[in-house]
């Protein structure tokens, strides 16, 4: 049996009439009208998240880039980021002409707070917290440390739509929250992203820089005074979202709660099953964290490199694509592959974790019976790998 764990859910039927209408009109550009689908998406997403403002753009990476530019940091300023994230995050920092500083990440996939505090020096001008694969670092400590030094915090919540921390929605804790609409995320437009903030100056700067040229910022329905002071003073990066993408996302907003709930159900059912084996460890979330996962990560305990490779090979034979972050050639989540950075930092915990951390997509559309079968295949693959290595 082979499980297709990469195909997304179908776009809800309610989007189809509006898609047909826009295909007939050809009106794909967001600024052709006052209340375009992109504008409506921004309003609806902000309301859903409890934020004052939202800006939809071409990707989560674009949202992070624009957010960093909007902070008006000096060129080359240092930005603290986790050592475990997707390559797009340090890339966005570099794109904003800033310097990433990587924090060591523990075996539970969350930032090591001792290393975070040690590296939060006077040279650090901003922090990007990547909730990688939906795992939330200690936001209470992060915010307390950063607030004490007046350092802005940006949340990369690409994997964390639907997650809460002490009941507060992830993406609303820092100064800015950035989300993804890429196909493997909770909301699927193929590509796309959105940022949220309560800061009027931040939203004005990001709107203009996203490509609201001339006076197109007026179509966002916000205070003219704030935008007026930035008119013609900021570069235009043209990272706008199209109306077609916005229609796809708007139709899925009503699915967020259900997908988050079902994703957590599937994750916890599989975690409970495979954690019965002493060779597999599924780190528990931090107490304030209520997750909305669409994948599962687990660690191989006391495995050699050969045994780890044998396990992933056995999983592939069984029809499930389990991968190990650090053992995939060129994996974009392994910090030593970010060769566009100057030098490779010493992150011993992160390196050790990546060499034994397994990754498996677990879409919310799966049934509990399918999840149970996947668990059986993981456990049987484990035994098969152990037997092969012992032979």
Describe the residue ranges of each PLM region:
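Conserved PLP-anchoring active-site segment centered on the Schiff-base-forming lysine
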Residues: 65-119, 128, 315
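Active-site phosphate-binding strand-loop segment of PLP-dependent enzymes
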Residues: 108-189, 194-202
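Conserved PLP cofactor-binding pocket of PLP-dependent enzymes
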Residues: 214-225, 269-272, 311-358, 387-390
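Conserved PLP-binding active-site segment of the aspartate aminotransferase-like
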Residues: 286, 293-304, 333-342, 355-369
């Amino acid at each position: 049996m082979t499980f297709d764990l990469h195909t997304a859910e179908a776009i809800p039927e309610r989007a189809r009439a509006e898609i047909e209408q826009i295909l007939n009109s050809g009106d794909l550009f967001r600024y052709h009208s006052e209340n375009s689908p992109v504008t409506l998406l921004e309003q609806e997403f902000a309301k859903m998240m409890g934020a004052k403002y939202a800006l939809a753009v071409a990707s989560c990476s674009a949202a992070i880039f624009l957010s960093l530019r909007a902070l008006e940091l000096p060129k080359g300023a240092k930005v603290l980021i986790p050592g475990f994230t997707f390559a797009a995050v340090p890339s966005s920092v570099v794109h904003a002409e800033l310097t990433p500083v990587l924090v060591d990440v523990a075996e539970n996939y969350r930032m090591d707070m001792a290393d975070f505090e040690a590296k939060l020096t006077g040279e650090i001008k901003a922090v990007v917290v990547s909730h990688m694969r939906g795992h939330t670092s200690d936001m209470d400590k992060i915010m307390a440390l950063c607030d004490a030094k007046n350092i802005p915090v940006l949340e990369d919540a690409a994997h964390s739509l639907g997650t809460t921390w002490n009941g507060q929605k992830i993406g609303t804790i820092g100064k800015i929250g950035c989300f993804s609409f890429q196909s493997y995320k909770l909301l699927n437009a193929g590509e796309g992203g959105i940022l949220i903030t309560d800061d009027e100056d931040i939203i004005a700067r990001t709107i203009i820089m996203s490509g609201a040229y001339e006076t197109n910022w007026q179509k966002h329905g916000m205070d003219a005074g704030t935008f007026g002071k930035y008119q013609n003073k900021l570069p235009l990066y043209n990272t706008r979202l199209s109306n077609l993408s916005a229609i796809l996302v708007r139709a899925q907003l009503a699915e967020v709660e259900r997908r988050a709930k079902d994703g957590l159900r599937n994750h916890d059912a599989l975690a409970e099953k495979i954690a019965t084996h002493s060779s597999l460890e599924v780190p528990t979330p931090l107490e304030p964290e209520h997750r909305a996962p669409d994948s599962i990560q687990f660690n191989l305990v006391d495995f050699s490199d050969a045994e780890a490779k044998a396990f992933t090979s056995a999983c592939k034979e069984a029809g499930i694509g389990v991968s190990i972050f650090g053992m995939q050639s060129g994996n974009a989540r392994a910090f030593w592959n970010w060769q566009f950075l100057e030098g490779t930092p010493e992150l011993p915990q992160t390196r050790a974790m990546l060499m034994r951390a397994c990754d498996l997509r677990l879409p919310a559309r799966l049934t509990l019976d399918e999840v149970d079968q996947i668990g059986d295949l993981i456990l049987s693959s484990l035994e098969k790998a152990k037997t092969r290595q012992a032979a």
